[in-house]
Amino acid sequence: MNLVEAVTHVKEKSKKRRFTQTYELIINLKKDYDLKKAENRVVDYFELPHGRGKKVKICAIVAQELEKPASRVFDYVILRDKLPEIAGNKRLAKKIAKSYYIFVAQALVMPDIGKYLGKYLGPRDKMPNPKYGMIVPNNALEEQLRSTYDRLQKLVRVSIKNHLTFGVPIGTEEMDPKLVAENAREFLNWLFNRIPGGRQSIDSVYLKLTMSNSIRII
């Protein structure tokens, strides 16, 4: 079956739940894919063309001058002056690092983030990265922050470091199956070009909903 048929089939065979389920691709790399080699370890983001169908929580870390506009846009805002206090509370720092999918930083605050939160965000691959537009100008306007927030909502993180199996969300059951299928297709095309060995490095790919059985698509 093609991808649209696979998306439809998974939904039809899944029991109705009391929440909106997420479609997920489960990718299994081949057993000889050597994660001990640095070049084989991948941490990257992919922008889903049609988004993921539900919002992720994004935290902004800024100085005083961006507090008000950032507070109107982001799900949570941390002021630079509060970073030492947060870093001194290990439980709070871990909770914040876990609670937000993406962290955005005002450019001038980046050195402080590395100093105070680096050991909490780094291992989770959540340090703000300019490559993905996670660092905003010091004089950013509210509309710039809103544009950043909306674009980052489409990102999914790929982390291949310790395990040969990983999952990636590609949409929800409320989305048009054609859009979910296109998200899946575009992601896989990107992945084939992103990892060493390309498609030959992949053993199998499965599609599932949060609480459904999976079906093999590759």
Predicted regions and their residues:
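Residue-level signature of catalytic and energy-coupling elements of molecular machines
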Residues: 6, 70, 122, 207
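Flexible, glycine/charged-enriched surface loops at secondary-structure junctions
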Residues: 19-23, 158-160, 194-206
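Long, charge-patterned amphipathic alpha-helical coiled-coil/hairpin "stalk" segments used as oligomerization
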Residues: 80-181, 185
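A conserved acidic, glycine/proline-rich C-terminal tail/linker
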Residues: 182-196
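C-terminal edge-of-domain segments
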Residues: 206-218
